[in-house]
């Protein structure tokens, strides 16, 4: 279900104004199965109901329209294999499809789909090695580039690709990339990321050099970069015994630190960062808490009111 909050508010409502709607089926305006994005005054999503389709809707959740059917992956027997990862970027849906691994020459299919016309282009066909499977994590998009892992070639490490979304070609491969490294963010052709066991790093593409900006010997870190801040959720080891949330400004000055406690069985996950809040979940999906970014010197988890308890009439 799609939920929304008014600007400056942390109270979420179901995006549906149908009278007496129970918000529990595909007939609800807010119903959406996978993927969600915004572009040029419309909302977009992907539905798996009967057809594998990209849909467009108005900002109030009404007038659902099919833009196009997403490319289907079929095995040697012609059976359909649907699903994958979905990223909305600058008027396009970037779709990393599940390859049919029963095919001996399978490789990861990557598509660029124009949101308003449905025009579809397959990317990186000439560059992605055979037997490249769908990456469950480590994928990011920024500044016109897709970053994603390639098949592992050595113990604990895997090549990491930088693909140009305009040309459809892979331009760079980081050969020595640990699975525990964070995803990459590209600002003005400088790459930002956390390297496991090393710290927060910058990579100058023009010079081909990496600089460690904040040395940090932690096992793993989720990172969220904004125009003004950097937020990290660090884990001390593979046992996940200690989890710390750190806030820095873009000059790498530490602004705040919070030792997280488990909520249920897990430490909270970083999910979304906006101008008004850093949102966290306890299951890697459902937002349950937020942090006020205006008080980073005293980081505090604030629990959201259950968004499923209300609807917008």
Task: Describe each model-derived feature in a short phrase.
Residues 218-243:
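Loop/turn-rich, solvent-exposed surfaces of beta-rich toroidal or solenoidal domains
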């Amino acid at each position: 279900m799609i939920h929304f909050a008014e600007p400056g508010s942390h109270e979420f409502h179901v995006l549906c104004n149908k009278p007496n709607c129970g918000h529990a089926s595909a007939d609800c305006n807010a119903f959406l199965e996978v993927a969600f994005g915004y572009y040029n005054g419309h909302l977009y999503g992907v539905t798996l109901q009967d057809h594998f389709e990209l849909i467009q809707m108005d900002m109030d959740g009404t007038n659902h329209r099919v833009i196009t059917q997403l490319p289907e992956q079929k095995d040697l027997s012609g059976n359909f294999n649907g699903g994958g990862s979905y990223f909305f970027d600058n008027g396009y849906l970037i779709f990393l499809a599940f390859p049919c691994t029963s095919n001996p020459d399978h490789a990861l299919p990557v598509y660029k789909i124009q949101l308003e016309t449905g025009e579809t282009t397959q990317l990186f066909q000439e560059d992605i090695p055979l037997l490249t499977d769908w990456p469950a994590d480590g994928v990011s998009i920024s500044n016109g580039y897709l970053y994603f892992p390639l098949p592992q070639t050595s113990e604990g490490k895997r090549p990491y690709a930088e693909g140009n979304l305009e040309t459809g070609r892979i331009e760079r491969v980081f050969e020595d990339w640990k699975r525990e490294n964070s995803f990459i963010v590209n600002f003005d052709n400088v790459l930002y990321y956390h390297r496991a066991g090393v710290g927060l790093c910058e990579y100058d593409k023009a010079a081909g050099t990496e600089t460690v900006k904040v040395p940090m010997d932690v096992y793993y870190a989720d990172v969220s970069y904004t125009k003004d801040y950097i937020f990290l959720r660090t884990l001390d080891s593979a046992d996940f015994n200690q989890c710390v949330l750190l806030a820095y400004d873009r000059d790498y000055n530490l602004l705040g630190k919070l030792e997280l406690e488990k909520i249920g069985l897990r430490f909270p996950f970083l999910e979304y960062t906006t101008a008004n809040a850093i949102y966290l979940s306890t299951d890697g999906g459902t937002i349950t808490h937020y942090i006020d970014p205006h008080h980073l010197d005293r980081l505090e988890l604030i629990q959201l009111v259950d968004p499923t308890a209300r609807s917008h009439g």
